Amino acid sequence: MARMVKCIKLGREAEGLDFPPYPGPLGKRLWEEVSKEAWADWMKQQTMLVNENRLNLADARARQYLARQMEKHFFGDGADAVQGYVPPSA
């Protein structure tokens, strides 16, 4: 049976992550409070941030920026908006 969590992002019970997605206390908190669905949404947001800001993930400053954005996305007031992004209309 899948592990269920009260997802902090979705505000409801959902299937939890299989393992901590990040090292340290932040990774433990993500594992305990974030669902697979919310993590997948973050991965899309992270990809847009990397691409639109032309981040080089070999650069420690870029990785630190993404870590701050991830924390803001889940536990703060939301990650930075991607400049110029217009969501597709249905």
UniProtKB/Swiss-Prot annotation:
An annotated Gene Ontology molecular function: iron ion binding
Pfam family, one: Iron_traffic
Origin: domain of life: Bacteria
Ranges annotated as spanning the membrane: none
Gene Ontology biological-process entries: cellular response to oxidative stress
GO CC annotations, alphabetized: cytosol
Swiss-Prot/TrEMBL keywords: Iron
HAMAP family cross-referenced by the UniProt entry: Fe_traffic_YggX
Function: Could be a mediator in iron transactions between iron acquisition and iron-requiring processes, such as synthesis and/or repair of Fe-S clusters in biosynthetic enzymes.
Family: Belongs to the Fe(2+)-trafficking protein family.
Protein name (Swiss-Prot/TrEMBL): Probable Fe(2+)-trafficking protein
Lineage: Bacteria, Pseudomonadati, Pseudomonadota, Betaproteobacteria, Burkholderiales
